[in-house]
């Protein structure tokens, strides 16, 4: 009989975007419980060992973490399987590096280096707004933060800018047509574009239509949309390709062009 939560994760059952090979072992690091879901996070060990190549083994990652070098969203994390997720800021004080986890157009977490200034804040999507004890309004974000007494103008699906030093809201972006957004789920994961319109379907999912910088349009559920800036100016730095997904033919042409220019 199974007692308690699962403690293991087989390598073949691990999320595809971690990009672990099948043959190096049987198991993968199972992320701890935390602010992001298992299928939508990147454990710290995968980030440090497989992405940044700062360690060769899990043991080495543990030694790095236990020296309290790694901060996520401004807090020291020593758990090597801590689930870092979309929009999290990972800081390594020893090397003076800062990274933000954002999706590339293939739906994987890109290693996006950011400046010290940008590492001071993060964007969070508002998941729900409730009124708690004694009539205190609360707002819950996509990374499980609960913030009391938010601005009454902030609504569900808006994006709030949070100062990581204080955990307070410093600004917010309305969910509105004409604002730039990133898709954080579904088949269009990682694409960036401007919201053109929103179809309301009471009792079902609202559908949002988005147009990217190349003029390609696509649609997705409202739950997959994360507004990242006012107008077409994003408040965060985007990974290479700026969230524009190329077709297979376009990718091939681009590869050939770079080959010819370098050859």
UniProtKB/Swiss-Prot annotation:
* The keyword Signal belongs to this UniProt entry's keyword annotation: no
InterPro entries attached to this UniProt entry:
KOW, Rib_uL2_dom2, Ribosomal_eS4, Ribosomal_eS4_C, Ribosomal_eS4_central_region, Ribosomal_eS4_central_sf, Ribosomal_eS4_KOW, Ribosomal_eS4_N
Specify whether Phosphoprotein is a keyword of the entry.
Answer: no
Which part of the chain is the S4 RNA-binding domain? 42-104
Q: Name one GO molecular function term.
A: structural constituent of ribosome
Q: According to the lineage, what is the superkingdom?
A: Eukaryota
GO CC annotation: what is one?
cytosolic small ribosomal subunit
The record's keywords, sorted A to Z, are:
Ribonucleoprotein, Ribosomal protein, RNA-binding, rRNA-binding
Which one GO biological process term can you cite for this protein? translation
Regarding protein family, the annotation reads:
Belongs to the eukaryotic ribosomal protein eS4 family.
Protein name per Swiss-Prot or TrEMBL = Small ribosomal subunit protein eS4
Organism the protein comes from: Pongo pygmaeus (Bornean orangutan)
Q: Which gene encodes it?
A: RPS4Y1
